[in-house]
């Protein structure tokens, strides 16, 4: 929106042409989302408290979590609001990827919102059925896959890129691409949701991963940089960097209120949406494997649940004291803040490893 205004003003004052630079708009998007989140945060938390949208805590979990009962949840609405407003302000609204990302973000956010609402109304920590949640997540992911492959302008936009190796690619057909897109988007969405179990645990990793994906998006959208770094050139992908920057800024603002002891929880409305958005960005810029590396924390959390369930069904025994993984370490004696900060450090190392694939090929 502001880009259109800047283009018009640029005809009279050349200084406004500076807003054509994606890097500047990405920085401004991050700051804008951060500002909106910090400004609206107290009001949103107050309204959630007035609506008695309190978190229902599992009684079979760590007993230290019982004090969190009643803390306002659905704080992800603040994140989505900040991202939405900021993206509309600073992104190029003629870019197809911008609208796809907003559709995925708010589509999965709506699923999470309904899930959270059921938890609050019925005081049931389980929310809506897993089958219903998976159905709607799948519908959104398949839509994204079909849309991307039907609008792809170059073969590179649908090829799987293997990091650390030059020119090692695997072309996909329509079905293969949609299947990959499905697993990346739905998998990341649920993995982030599983990670969001401690104060600040999910927000900071999302900040780091989204900031790193912004770099990949900028490079993929620039033919010169993409060629130099042996990455696929995806026309228009540079605008995705603005969205990623907005996501990082919004989550950073949310962390201000979600840091221990949390004043508000993200809820499914935020976690499902952020995970799906990260997955969609990775698919757009053809960095699904790199997302698997940088989002290793999310992968570990999801795997811990799958391993726990499979082990219990097959052998009747549990591998972990409790799943997801962060609860396992809590029950081993780690304090909540120790788990969170140590998992942040792990994510930082994984993100740096992911960024290294830009050059190490």
Curated annotation (Swiss-Prot):
The lineage of its organism: Bacteria, Pseudomonadati, Pseudomonadota, Betaproteobacteria, Neisseriales. Its cofactor is Mg(2+). One of its GO terms (cellular component) is plasma membrane. Pathway: Cell wall biogenesis; peptidoglycan biosynthesis. Belongs to the glycosyltransferase 4 family. MraY subfamily. It comes from the Bacteria. It is an enzyme of class 2 (transferase). Pfam families: Glycos_transf_4. One of its GO terms (molecular function) is phospho-N-acetylmuramoyl-pentapeptide-transferase activity. It is a multi-pass membrane protein. It catalyses: UDP-N-acetyl-alpha-D-muramoyl-L-alanyl-gamma-D-glutamyl-meso-2,6-diaminopimeloyl-D-alanyl-D-alanine + di-trans,octa-cis-undecaprenyl phosphate = di-trans,octa-cis-undecaprenyl diphospho-N-acetyl-alpha-D-muramoyl-L-alanyl-D-glutamyl-meso-2,6-diaminopimeloyl-D-alanyl-D-alanine + UMP. It is found in: Cell inner membrane. The keyword Cell wall biogenesis/degradation applies. Its EC number is 2.7.8.13. Its main location: membrane. This is Phospho-N-acetylmuramoyl-pentapeptide-transferase. Catalyzes the initial step of the lipid cycle reactions in the biosynthesis of the cell wall peptidoglycan: transfers peptidoglycan precursor phospho-MurNAc-pentapeptide from UDP-MurNAc-pentapeptide onto the lipid carrier undecaprenyl phosphate, yielding undecaprenyl-pyrophosphoryl-MurNAc-pentapeptide, known as lipid I. The chain crosses the membrane at residues 25-45, 73-93, 97-117, 134-154, 168-188, 200-220, 240-260, 264-284, 289-309, 338-358. Keywords: Cell cycle, Cell division, Cell inner membrane, Cell membrane, Cell shape, Cell wall biogenesis/degradation, Magnesium, Membrane, Metal-binding, Peptidoglycan synthesis, Transferase, Transmembrane, Transmembrane helix. One of its GO terms (biological process) is peptidoglycan biosynthetic process. PROSITE patterns: MRAY_2.
């Amino acid at each position: 929106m502001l880009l259109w205004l800047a283009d018009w003003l640029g005809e009279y004052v050349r200084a406004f042409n500076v807003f054509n630079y994606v890097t500047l708009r990405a920085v401004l998007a991050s700051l804008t989302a951060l500002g909106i989140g910090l400004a609206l945060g107290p009001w949103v938390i107050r309204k959630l408290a007035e609506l008695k949208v309190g978190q229902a805590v599992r009684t079979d979990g760590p007993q230290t979590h019982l004090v969190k009962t009643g803390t306002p949840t659905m704080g992800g609405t603040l994140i989505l609001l900040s991202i939405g407003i900021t993206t509309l302000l600073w992104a190029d609204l003629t870019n197809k990827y911008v609208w796809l990302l907003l559709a995925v973000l708010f589509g999965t956010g709506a699923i999470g919102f309904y899930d959270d609402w059921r938890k609050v109304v019925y005081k049931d920590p389980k929310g809506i059925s897993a089958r219903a949640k998976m159905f709607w997540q799948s519908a959104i992911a398949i839509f994204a896959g079909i849309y991307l492959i039907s609008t792809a302008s170059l073969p590179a936009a649908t090829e799987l890129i293997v990091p650390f190796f030059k020119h090692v690619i695997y072309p996909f057909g329509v079905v293969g691409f949609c299947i990959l897109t499905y697993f990346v988007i739905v998998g990341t969405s649920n993995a982030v949701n599983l990670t969001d179990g401690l104060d600040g645990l999910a927000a900071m990793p999302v900040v780091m991963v989204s900031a790193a994906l912004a770099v990949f998006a900028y490079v993929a959208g620039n033919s010169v940089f993409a060629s130099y770094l042996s990455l696929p050139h995806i026309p228009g992908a540079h605008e995705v960097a603005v969205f990623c920057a907005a996501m990082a800024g919004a989550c950073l603002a949310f962390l201000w209120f979600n840091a221990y002891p949390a004043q508000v929880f993200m809820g499914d409305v935020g976690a499902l949406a952020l995970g799906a958005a990260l997955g969609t960005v990775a698919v757009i810029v053809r960095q699904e494997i790199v997302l698997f590396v940088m989002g290793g924390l999310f992968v570990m959390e999801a795997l811990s649940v799958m391993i726990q369930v499979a082990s219990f069904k097959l052998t009747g025994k549990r591998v972990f004291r409790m799943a997801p993984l962060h609860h396992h370490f809590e029950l081993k004696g780690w304090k909540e803040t120790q788990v969170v900060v140590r998992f942040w450090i792990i994510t930082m190392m994984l993100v740096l490893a992911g960024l290294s694939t830009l050059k190490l090929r």
